[in-house]
Amino acid sequence: MNMLEETLETIKAYVALTKPRVIELLLVATIPAMLQAERGENNIGLILLTLLGGWMGAAAANTFNMVADSDIDQKMGRTRARPLVRNKVSNRHASVFAWTLTVVSFLWLWVLCRSVLAGLFILLTIFFYIFVYTKYLKRKTHLNIVWGGAAGCMPVVVGWAVITDNLPAGTPAQWWQAIVLFMVIFFWTPPHTWALAMKYKDDYARAGVPMLPVVRTPVEVTRQIVWYTVATVLTTFLLIPAASWIHAIIAVVSGVWFLVMAVRLHNGIKNGGEVKPLKLFILSNNYLAVYFVGLSIDAVLGWETIGGHLGWTTTFF
């Protein structure tokens, strides 16, 4: 292998440390939050700057996670090809990389995006993801992904903070909408993750990670998936007064679609049929993407909100 090939392999290893596919999903959540926060204004430059700062923060968290989980990754077939397991990058170099991304992400959001609050949210997210979720919850409780999933909800809060810190003085921040979007992802994370964990249950058991499918029956797991799916869909409805009919239609149609598939998985398990949990995992990704794209379109168009049409106070809607 020549020097160029070695350099490319090293770059690929560092990129893999950041879990780029996971980051894509996180960034998908940031865009609609920012568009909704500045409804109709569409400050594309600020959004792009925030996405880059958020990408660095998420990349730092994922890299720290790989360092902390390297012992587990060695035991799981799904993760044995990761860079640290294969010694493509040393733990020390990965840690330096993660710390560098952390500092740059914080300064980026503070200075270039003019939001120290967003920078602090990034630091809080990284701390929570590593020290609360990765080092404790993931290894100690079957509710690991329920509470640990809060870290994955933070991109909407980061994006909202950037917009509100750049709004004209006196403009209502409407943080309740950010909280709703936070809770949408919070409730969505368990069914999304448990569907994948059902597929790789033996892997998690071998690594000693008490994911719900490892410690509960498939019927109980899918029952919980249905309940969290219901909570996800109902939470999206809370935002209906703050958006137009476009969001309302997409929230209802995509929500029913997601719920029907979750119920179908549960009934298939309960009736002893052949089921494919990975289908729900993929569909859950598609559901969230469809919902957030719909919300983004609604916010970009900036049409009158349903709450405004009903004459409710503009302070909230």
From Swiss-Prot:
Pfam families with a match to the protein in the record: UbiA (PF01040)
Entry-linked CDD domains: PT_UbiA_Cox10
Record's keyword annotation contains Chloroplast: no
Main location as per UniProt: membrane
Enzyme class: transferase
Known function: Converts heme B (protoheme IX) to heme O by substitution of the vinyl group on carbon 2 of heme B porphyrin ring with a hydroxyethyl farnesyl side group.
Protein name as annotated: Protoheme IX farnesyltransferase
Gene (UniProt): ctaB
